[in-house]
Protein backbone atom coordinates (compact mmCIF):
# COMPACT_ATOMS: atom_id res chain seq x y z
CA UNK A 1 0.00 0.00 0.00
CA UNK A 2 1.17 3.52 -0.81
CA UNK A 3 2.27 5.63 2.17
CA UNK A 4 2.42 8.90 0.19
CA UNK A 5 0.74 11.98 1.66
CA UNK A 6 -2.09 13.68 -0.29
CA UNK A 7 0.27 16.53 -1.28
CA UNK A 8 2.82 14.01 -2.63
CA UNK A 9 0.11 12.15 -4.58
CA UNK A 10 -1.16 15.40 -6.15
CA UNK A 11 2.43 16.38 -6.98
CA UNK A 12 2.94 13.06 -8.82
CA UNK A 13 -0.36 13.46 -10.69
CA UNK A 14 0.65 17.02 -11.68
CA UNK A 15 3.56 15.56 -13.65
CA UNK A 16 1.14 13.89 -16.06
CA UNK A 17 -2.23 15.69 -15.78
CA UNK A 18 -2.84 19.42 -16.22
CA UNK A 19 -5.36 21.19 -13.97
CA UNK A 20 -8.29 19.31 -12.36
CA UNK A 21 -7.02 20.08 -8.84
CA UNK A 22 -10.38 19.20 -7.22
CA UNK A 23 -10.39 15.70 -8.70
CA UNK A 24 -6.73 15.15 -7.82
CA UNK A 25 -7.31 16.22 -4.20
CA UNK A 26 -10.35 13.93 -3.89
CA UNK A 27 -8.52 10.81 -5.10
CA UNK A 28 -5.40 11.73 -3.09
CA UNK A 29 -7.40 11.99 0.14
CA UNK A 30 -9.25 8.74 -0.64
CA UNK A 31 -5.94 6.95 -1.22
CA UNK A 32 -4.40 8.37 1.96
CA UNK A 33 -7.48 7.35 3.96
CA UNK A 34 -6.72 3.70 3.09
CA UNK A 35 -3.40 4.07 4.95
CA UNK A 36 -4.99 6.02 7.83
CA UNK A 37 -7.59 3.32 8.33
CA UNK A 38 -4.86 0.68 8.71
CA UNK A 39 -3.41 2.68 11.62
CA UNK A 40 -6.74 2.64 13.52
CA UNK A 41 -7.19 -0.15 16.08
CA UNK A 42 -9.93 -2.77 15.94
CA UNK A 43 -12.96 -2.85 16.19
CA UNK A 44 -13.29 0.75 14.96
CA UNK A 45 -11.20 -0.08 11.87
CA UNK A 46 -13.92 -2.39 10.55
CA UNK A 47 -16.51 0.39 10.84
CA UNK A 48 -14.53 2.85 8.70
CA UNK A 49 -15.62 2.33 5.09
CA UNK A 50 -14.19 4.15 2.06
CA UNK A 51 -16.11 7.14 0.69
CA UNK A 52 -16.68 6.34 -2.98
CA UNK A 53 -16.06 9.07 -5.58
CA UNK A 54 -18.08 10.12 -8.64
CA UNK A 55 -16.07 12.13 -11.21
CA UNK A 56 -18.19 14.19 -13.62
CA UNK A 57 -16.72 15.88 -16.67
CA UNK A 58 -16.59 15.91 -20.48
CA UNK A 59 -14.49 13.41 -22.37
CA UNK A 60 -10.75 13.99 -22.69
CA UNK A 61 -10.25 16.16 -19.57
CA UNK A 62 -8.31 13.61 -17.50
CA UNK A 63 -10.79 11.29 -15.73
CA UNK A 64 -9.33 8.06 -17.10
CA UNK A 65 -5.76 9.37 -16.94
CA UNK A 66 -6.19 10.16 -13.23
CA UNK A 67 -7.30 6.56 -12.69
CA UNK A 68 -4.41 5.16 -14.75
CA UNK A 69 -1.80 7.17 -12.88
CA UNK A 70 -3.47 6.41 -9.54
CA UNK A 71 -3.08 2.69 -10.27
CA UNK A 72 0.70 3.09 -10.50
CA UNK A 73 0.87 5.16 -7.31
CA UNK A 74 -1.51 3.04 -5.25
CA UNK A 75 0.64 -0.08 -4.99
CA UNK A 76 -2.66 -1.89 -4.46
CA UNK A 77 -4.96 -4.17 -6.51
CA UNK A 78 -6.57 -1.90 -9.10
CA UNK A 79 -8.95 -2.57 -11.98
CA UNK A 80 -10.49 -0.22 -14.54
CA UNK A 81 -13.65 -1.42 -16.24
CA UNK A 82 -16.42 0.09 -18.37
CA UNK A 83 -19.87 -0.12 -16.81
CA UNK A 84 -21.34 -0.73 -20.29
CA UNK A 85 -19.71 -4.20 -20.45
CA UNK A 86 -22.10 -5.62 -17.89
CA UNK A 87 -25.68 -6.82 -18.15
CA UNK A 88 -28.37 -7.57 -15.63
CA UNK A 89 -28.24 -11.06 -14.14
CA UNK A 90 -30.26 -13.38 -16.37
CA UNK A 91 -29.26 -11.72 -19.64
CA UNK A 92 -26.47 -12.81 -21.97
CA UNK A 93 -23.24 -11.07 -20.97
CA UNK A 94 -20.98 -10.53 -17.96
CA UNK A 95 -22.44 -9.98 -14.51
CA UNK A 96 -20.95 -7.48 -12.07
CA UNK A 97 -19.48 -10.17 -9.77
CA UNK A 98 -16.82 -10.74 -12.43
CA UNK A 99 -15.35 -7.35 -11.40
CA UNK A 100 -14.24 -8.86 -8.09
CA UNK A 101 -13.03 -12.07 -9.76
CA UNK A 102 -10.86 -10.05 -12.15
CA UNK A 103 -9.60 -7.91 -9.25
CA UNK A 104 -8.56 -10.98 -7.22
CA UNK A 105 -6.68 -12.37 -10.25
CA UNK A 106 -4.76 -9.07 -10.47
CA UNK A 107 -4.06 -9.22 -6.73
CA UNK A 108 -2.76 -12.81 -6.89
CA UNK A 109 -0.40 -11.86 -9.73
CA UNK A 110 0.77 -8.77 -7.79
CA UNK A 111 1.28 -10.72 -4.56
CA UNK A 112 3.14 -13.54 -6.33
CA UNK A 113 5.49 -11.04 -8.01
CA UNK A 114 6.05 -9.24 -4.70
CA UNK A 115 6.85 -12.49 -2.86
CA UNK A 116 9.15 -13.65 -5.68
CA UNK A 117 11.11 -10.40 -5.45
CA UNK A 118 11.76 -11.12 -1.77
CA UNK A 119 13.36 -14.50 -2.51
CA UNK A 120 14.96 -13.58 -5.86
CA UNK A 121 18.45 -13.15 -4.40
CA UNK A 122 18.40 -16.63 -2.86
CA UNK A 123 16.78 -18.09 -6.00
CA UNK A 124 19.51 -16.54 -8.17
CA UNK A 125 22.21 -18.21 -6.06
CA UNK A 126 20.51 -21.59 -6.45
CA UNK A 127 20.07 -21.05 -10.20
CA UNK A 128 23.79 -20.24 -10.49
CA UNK A 129 24.60 -23.46 -8.60
CA UNK A 130 22.48 -25.48 -11.05
CA UNK A 131 24.24 -23.91 -14.04
CA UNK A 132 27.67 -24.49 -12.47
CA UNK A 133 26.73 -28.14 -11.81
CA UNK A 134 26.11 -28.51 -15.56
CA UNK A 135 29.29 -26.68 -16.56
CA UNK A 136 31.46 -28.34 -13.90
CA UNK A 137 30.11 -31.77 -12.94
CA UNK A 138 31.25 -32.88 -9.48
CA UNK A 139 34.28 -35.24 -9.79
CA UNK A 140 33.80 -38.75 -8.48
CA UNK A 141 35.60 -39.35 -5.20
CA UNK A 142 38.74 -41.36 -6.08
CA UNK A 143 41.66 -41.86 -3.71
CA UNK A 144 41.97 -41.35 0.00
CA UNK A 145 42.84 -38.65 2.50
CA UNK A 146 44.83 -35.70 1.22
CA UNK A 147 44.29 -36.38 -2.48
CA UNK A 148 40.49 -36.16 -2.15
CA UNK A 149 40.72 -32.95 -0.09
CA UNK A 150 43.11 -31.42 -2.61
CA UNK A 151 40.74 -32.30 -5.49
CA UNK A 152 37.80 -30.68 -3.62
CA UNK A 153 39.82 -27.50 -3.03
CA UNK A 154 40.71 -27.32 -6.73
CA UNK A 155 37.08 -27.89 -7.71
CA UNK A 156 35.83 -25.18 -5.32
CA UNK A 157 38.38 -22.71 -6.67
CA UNK A 158 37.32 -23.49 -10.24
CA UNK A 159 33.63 -23.07 -9.30
CA UNK A 160 34.32 -19.66 -7.77
CA UNK A 161 36.19 -18.59 -10.92
CA UNK A 162 33.29 -19.71 -13.12
CA UNK A 163 30.73 -18.08 -10.77
CA UNK A 164 32.61 -14.77 -11.11
CA UNK A 165 32.65 -15.09 -14.91
CA UNK A 166 28.94 -16.01 -14.87
CA UNK A 167 28.03 -12.92 -12.85
CA UNK A 168 30.14 -10.68 -15.09
CA UNK A 169 28.25 -11.96 -18.15
CA UNK A 170 31.27 -13.59 -19.80
CA UNK A 171 29.37 -16.88 -20.26
CA UNK A 172 26.07 -15.40 -21.49
CA UNK A 173 26.37 -16.66 -25.08
CA UNK A 174 27.44 -20.22 -24.19
CA UNK A 175 24.70 -22.82 -24.73
CA UNK A 176 23.82 -25.53 -22.21
CA UNK A 177 21.22 -28.28 -21.97
CA UNK A 178 18.99 -28.38 -18.93
CA UNK A 179 15.72 -29.89 -17.69
CA UNK A 180 12.97 -27.33 -17.14
CA UNK A 181 9.43 -27.74 -15.90
CA UNK A 182 7.11 -27.98 -18.87
CA UNK A 183 4.66 -25.04 -19.00
CA UNK A 184 1.05 -26.15 -18.68
CA UNK A 185 -0.80 -26.07 -21.98
CA UNK A 186 -3.43 -23.35 -22.17
CA UNK A 187 -6.97 -24.43 -22.95
CA UNK A 188 -9.76 -22.21 -24.26
CA UNK A 189 -13.26 -23.00 -23.06
CA UNK A 190 -16.30 -20.99 -24.12
CA UNK A 191 -17.96 -19.71 -20.95
CA UNK A 192 -21.78 -19.76 -20.85
CA UNK A 193 -23.25 -16.57 -19.36
CA UNK A 194 -22.98 -16.53 -15.57
CA UNK A 195 -20.77 -19.64 -15.44
CA UNK A 196 -17.33 -18.00 -15.67
CA UNK A 197 -16.33 -19.42 -12.27
CA UNK A 198 -17.07 -23.05 -13.23
CA UNK A 199 -15.30 -22.57 -16.58
CA UNK A 200 -12.23 -21.21 -14.79
CA UNK A 201 -12.17 -24.25 -12.49
CA UNK A 202 -12.38 -26.66 -15.46
CA UNK A 203 -9.59 -24.76 -17.24
CA UNK A 204 -7.46 -24.89 -14.08
CA UNK A 205 -8.09 -28.64 -13.71
CA UNK A 206 -6.94 -29.39 -17.27
CA UNK A 207 -3.90 -27.11 -17.00
CA UNK A 208 -2.77 -28.98 -13.86
CA UNK A 209 -2.81 -32.37 -15.63
CA UNK A 210 0.54 -31.77 -17.34
CA UNK A 211 2.23 -29.90 -14.51
CA UNK A 212 5.42 -31.30 -12.98
CA UNK A 213 6.74 -32.82 -16.22
CA UNK A 214 10.30 -31.95 -17.21
CA UNK A 215 11.39 -30.89 -20.67
CA UNK A 216 15.00 -30.93 -21.91
CA UNK A 217 15.96 -27.70 -23.67
CA UNK A 218 19.09 -26.19 -25.16
CA UNK A 219 19.35 -22.50 -24.22
CA UNK A 220 21.95 -19.80 -23.77
CA UNK A 221 23.21 -19.28 -20.23
CA UNK A 222 21.74 -15.77 -20.04
CA UNK A 223 18.24 -17.14 -20.69
CA UNK A 224 18.89 -20.25 -18.57
CA UNK A 225 19.75 -18.09 -15.55
CA UNK A 226 16.44 -16.23 -15.84
CA UNK A 227 14.38 -19.40 -16.34
CA UNK A 228 16.05 -21.24 -13.47
CA UNK A 229 15.77 -18.22 -11.15
CA UNK A 230 12.01 -18.04 -11.81
CA UNK A 231 11.70 -21.80 -11.27
CA UNK A 232 13.65 -21.73 -7.99
CA UNK A 233 11.74 -18.67 -6.74
CA UNK A 234 8.42 -20.38 -7.51
CA UNK A 235 9.51 -23.43 -5.46
CA UNK A 236 10.13 -21.20 -2.44
CA UNK A 237 6.62 -19.73 -2.48
CA UNK A 238 3.75 -21.11 -0.44
CA UNK A 239 0.76 -20.96 -2.81
CA UNK A 240 -1.81 -21.00 0.00
CA UNK A 241 -0.05 -18.12 1.72
CA UNK A 242 0.03 -16.15 -1.55
CA UNK A 243 -3.73 -16.69 -2.04
CA UNK A 244 -4.52 -15.65 1.54
CA UNK A 245 -2.44 -12.46 1.23
CA UNK A 246 -3.99 -11.66 -2.16
CA UNK A 247 -7.55 -11.97 -0.83
CA UNK A 248 -6.68 -9.84 2.19
CA UNK A 249 -5.06 -7.23 -0.06
CA UNK A 250 -8.18 -6.97 -2.22
CA UNK A 251 -10.49 -6.71 0.78
CA UNK A 252 -8.44 -4.01 2.53
CA UNK A 253 -6.81 -2.05 -0.33
CA UNK A 254 -8.66 -2.88 -3.57
CA UNK A 255 -9.67 -0.04 -5.91
CA UNK A 256 -12.26 -0.35 -8.70
CA UNK A 257 -12.56 2.37 -11.36
CA UNK A 258 -16.01 2.27 -13.01
CA UNK A 259 -15.85 4.22 -16.26
CA UNK A 260 -18.79 5.30 -18.45
CA UNK A 261 -21.27 5.03 -15.59
CA UNK A 262 -23.47 7.66 -17.27
CA UNK A 263 -24.16 5.19 -20.09
CA UNK A 264 -26.19 2.92 -17.79
CA UNK A 265 -28.59 5.62 -16.57
CA UNK A 266 -32.29 5.00 -17.06
CA UNK A 267 -32.78 8.16 -19.17
CA UNK A 268 -30.61 6.68 -21.93
CA UNK A 269 -33.03 3.75 -22.20
CA UNK A 270 -36.42 5.44 -22.10
CA UNK A 271 -38.63 3.90 -24.73
CA UNK A 272 -36.15 1.14 -25.57
CA UNK A 273 -37.90 -1.83 -24.07
CA UNK A 274 -36.04 -4.29 -26.29
CA UNK A 275 -32.64 -3.39 -24.84
CA UNK A 276 -31.04 -5.04 -21.84
CA UNK A 277 -32.14 -3.21 -18.69
CA UNK A 278 -29.39 -0.76 -17.69
CA UNK A 279 -31.31 -0.02 -14.52
CA UNK A 280 -30.88 -3.69 -13.69
CA UNK A 281 -27.09 -3.28 -13.96
CA UNK A 282 -27.30 -0.38 -11.50
CA UNK A 283 -29.25 -2.54 -9.06
CA UNK A 284 -26.70 -5.35 -9.44
CA UNK A 285 -23.92 -2.85 -8.66
CA UNK A 286 -25.63 -1.75 -5.42
CA UNK A 287 -24.64 -4.67 -3.15
CA UNK A 288 -21.14 -4.74 -4.65
CA UNK A 289 -20.55 -1.06 -3.88
CA UNK A 290 -22.25 -1.17 -0.49
CA UNK A 291 -20.51 -4.35 0.64
CA UNK A 292 -21.18 -8.00 -0.10
CA UNK A 293 -19.35 -11.32 -0.30
CA UNK A 294 -18.38 -12.72 -3.71
CA UNK A 295 -17.39 -16.34 -4.25
CA UNK A 296 -14.14 -16.72 -6.23
CA UNK A 297 -11.80 -19.65 -6.90
CA UNK A 298 -9.48 -18.21 -4.23
CA UNK A 299 -12.21 -18.14 -1.58
CA UNK A 300 -14.85 -15.68 -0.41
CA UNK A 301 -14.01 -12.00 -0.95
CA UNK A 302 -15.73 -9.21 0.99
CA UNK A 303 -16.20 -5.91 -0.83
CA UNK A 304 -17.00 -3.75 2.23
CA UNK A 305 -13.68 -1.86 2.13
CA UNK A 306 -13.02 -1.77 -1.63
CA UNK A 307 -12.87 1.82 -2.93
CA UNK A 308 -15.07 2.51 -5.98
CA UNK A 309 -14.34 5.50 -8.22
CA UNK A 310 -16.97 6.08 -10.92
CA UNK A 311 -16.74 8.50 -13.81
CA UNK A 312 -18.88 9.70 -16.66
CA UNK A 313 -19.28 12.59 -19.10
CA UNK A 314 -23.01 12.96 -18.32
CA UNK A 315 -23.71 14.73 -21.63
CA UNK A 316 -27.14 13.20 -22.20
CA UNK A 317 -27.88 12.34 -18.59
CA UNK A 318 -27.39 13.81 -15.14
CA UNK A 319 -26.03 12.15 -11.99
CA UNK A 320 -29.58 12.41 -10.64
CA UNK A 321 -30.68 9.99 -13.40
CA UNK A 322 -28.85 7.20 -11.57
CA UNK A 323 -31.16 5.29 -9.25
CA UNK A 324 -31.27 7.04 -5.83
CA UNK A 325 -29.73 4.09 -3.97
CA UNK A 326 -26.65 4.14 -6.23
CA UNK A 327 -26.33 7.92 -5.97
CA UNK A 328 -26.11 7.52 -2.20
CA UNK A 329 -23.20 5.07 -2.55
CA UNK A 330 -21.04 7.80 -4.16
CA UNK A 331 -21.05 10.59 -1.56
CA UNK A 332 -18.06 12.51 -2.97
CA UNK A 333 -18.88 14.33 -6.23
CA UNK A 334 -16.11 16.01 -8.22
CA UNK A 335 -16.67 18.08 -11.36
CA UNK A 336 -13.80 18.27 -13.84
CA UNK A 337 -13.38 21.47 -15.86
CA UNK A 338 -13.32 21.76 -19.63
CA UNK A 339 -9.87 22.54 -21.02
CA UNK A 340 -8.87 26.10 -21.95
CA UNK A 341 -6.27 27.23 -24.54
CA UNK A 342 -3.75 27.64 -21.70
CA UNK A 343 -4.45 24.07 -20.56
CA UNK A 344 -3.75 22.81 -24.09
CA UNK A 345 -0.45 24.72 -24.09
CA UNK A 346 0.58 23.13 -20.79
CA UNK A 347 -0.42 19.65 -21.98
CA UNK A 348 1.84 20.09 -25.02
CA UNK A 349 4.97 21.08 -23.09
CA UNK A 350 4.60 20.91 -19.28
CA UNK A 351 3.96 17.22 -18.56
CA UNK A 352 6.75 14.68 -18.07
CA UNK A 353 5.98 12.77 -21.27
CA UNK A 354 4.36 15.57 -23.27
CA UNK A 355 3.41 15.15 -26.93
CA UNK A 356 6.14 17.57 -27.98
CA UNK A 357 8.82 15.52 -26.17
CA UNK A 358 7.44 12.30 -27.68
CA UNK A 359 7.60 13.57 -31.27
CA UNK A 360 11.03 15.13 -30.73
CA UNK A 361 12.33 11.78 -29.46
CA UNK A 362 10.74 9.86 -32.36
CA UNK A 363 12.25 12.08 -35.05
CA UNK A 364 15.62 12.26 -33.26
CA UNK A 365 15.98 8.53 -34.06
CA UNK A 366 16.33 9.61 -37.73
CA UNK A 367 18.66 12.52 -36.83
CA UNK A 368 15.99 15.19 -37.41
CA UNK A 369 15.93 17.92 -34.75
CA UNK A 370 12.41 19.18 -34.10
CA UNK A 371 12.11 22.59 -32.41
CA UNK A 372 8.79 24.02 -31.24
CA UNK A 373 8.69 27.82 -30.94
CA UNK A 374 6.47 29.36 -28.23
CA UNK A 375 4.18 30.98 -30.83
CA UNK A 376 3.88 27.63 -32.62
CA UNK A 377 2.76 25.90 -29.41
CA UNK A 378 0.24 28.70 -28.77
CA UNK A 379 -1.18 28.43 -32.29
CA UNK A 380 -1.49 24.65 -31.99
CA UNK A 381 -3.38 25.05 -28.71
CA UNK A 382 -5.71 27.67 -30.23
CA UNK A 383 -6.51 25.46 -33.22
CA UNK A 384 -7.21 22.40 -31.02
CA UNK A 385 -9.48 24.51 -28.79
CA UNK A 386 -11.30 26.07 -31.78
CA UNK A 387 -11.93 22.71 -33.48
CA UNK A 388 -13.30 21.32 -30.20
CA UNK A 389 -15.69 24.28 -29.95
CA UNK A 390 -16.87 24.00 -33.57
CA UNK A 391 -17.28 20.21 -33.72
CA UNK A 392 -17.38 17.57 -30.99
CA UNK A 393 -15.49 18.47 -27.80
CA UNK A 394 -13.14 15.52 -27.22
CA UNK A 395 -10.82 17.39 -24.87
CA UNK A 396 -7.08 16.74 -24.89
CA UNK A 397 -7.48 13.87 -27.37
CA UNK A 398 -7.92 16.52 -30.07
CA UNK A 399 -4.22 17.36 -29.69
CA UNK A 400 -3.24 13.89 -30.95
CA UNK A 401 -5.18 14.48 -34.18
CA UNK A 402 -3.94 18.04 -34.66
CA UNK A 403 -0.24 17.36 -34.04
CA UNK A 404 -0.32 14.18 -36.16
CA UNK A 405 -1.75 16.17 -39.08
CA UNK A 406 0.80 18.96 -38.45
CA UNK A 407 3.82 16.64 -38.59
CA UNK A 408 2.49 14.33 -41.30
CA UNK A 409 4.89 15.58 -44.00
CA UNK A 410 7.94 15.74 -41.69
CA UNK A 411 7.33 12.22 -40.39
CA UNK A 412 6.87 10.86 -43.91
CA UNK A 413 10.07 12.33 -45.36
CA UNK A 414 12.26 12.28 -42.22
CA UNK A 415 14.75 9.91 -43.87
CA UNK A 416 15.56 12.57 -46.50
CA UNK A 417 16.25 15.29 -43.91
CA UNK A 418 18.84 13.62 -41.65
CA UNK A 419 20.98 16.17 -39.82
CA UNK A 420 18.48 18.98 -40.43
CA UNK A 421 16.58 21.17 -37.94
CA UNK A 422 12.84 21.75 -38.38
CA UNK A 423 11.29 24.68 -36.50
CA UNK A 424 7.56 24.62 -35.80
CA UNK A 425 6.40 28.22 -35.41
CA UNK A 426 3.02 29.92 -35.87
CA UNK A 427 3.57 30.35 -39.63
CA UNK A 428 4.42 26.66 -40.06
CA UNK A 429 1.28 25.68 -38.11
CA UNK A 430 -0.93 28.00 -40.18
CA UNK A 431 0.51 26.64 -43.44
CA UNK A 432 -0.12 23.05 -42.37
CA UNK A 433 -3.44 23.44 -40.54
CA UNK A 434 -4.90 26.88 -41.27
CA UNK A 435 -7.16 25.93 -44.17
CA UNK A 436 -8.35 22.69 -42.59
CA UNK A 437 -9.06 24.25 -39.17
CA UNK A 438 -11.06 27.16 -40.63
CA UNK A 439 -13.24 25.03 -42.91
CA UNK A 440 -15.76 23.44 -40.56
CA UNK A 441 -16.72 20.66 -42.98
CA UNK A 442 -13.06 19.71 -43.54
CA UNK A 443 -12.10 19.88 -39.86
CA UNK A 444 -15.06 17.65 -38.99
CA UNK A 445 -13.51 14.85 -41.06
CA UNK A 446 -9.77 15.59 -40.92
CA UNK A 447 -9.24 16.95 -37.41
From Swiss-Prot:
Belongs to the ClpX chaperone family. HslU subfamily. InterPro entries: AAA+_ATPase, ATP-dep_Clp_protease_ClpX, ATPase_AAA_core, Clp_ATPase_C, HslU, P-loop_NTPase. Keywords: ATP-binding, Chaperone, Cytoplasm, Nucleotide-binding, Stress response. GO terms for molecular function: ATP binding; ATP hydrolysis activity; peptidase activity; proteasome-activating activity. One of its GO terms (cellular component) is HslUV protease complex. It comes from Burkholderia vietnamiensis (strain G4 / LMG 22486) (Burkholderia cepacia (strain R1808)). GO terms for biological process: protein unfolding; proteolysis involved in protein catabolic process. PANTHER family: ATP-DEPENDENT CLP PROTEASE ATP-BINDING SUBUNIT CLPX-LIKE, MITOCHONDRIAL-RELATED, ATP-DEPENDENT PROTEASE ATPASE SUBUNIT HSLU. CDD domains: RecA-like_HslU (cd19498). The keyword DNA-binding does not apply. A double ring-shaped homohexamer of HslV is capped on each side by a ring-shaped HslU homohexamer. The assembly of the HslU/HslV complex is dependent on binding of ATP. ATPase subunit of a proteasome-like degradation complex; this subunit has chaperone activity. The binding of ATP and its subsequent hydrolysis by HslU are essential for unfolding of protein substrates subsequently hydrolyzed by HslV. HslU recognizes the N-terminal part of its protein substrates and unfolds these before they are guided to HslV for hydrolysis. The gene is hslU. It comes from the Bacteria. It is found in: Cytoplasm. This is ATP-dependent protease ATPase subunit HslU. ATP binds at residues 18, 60-65, 259, 325, 397.
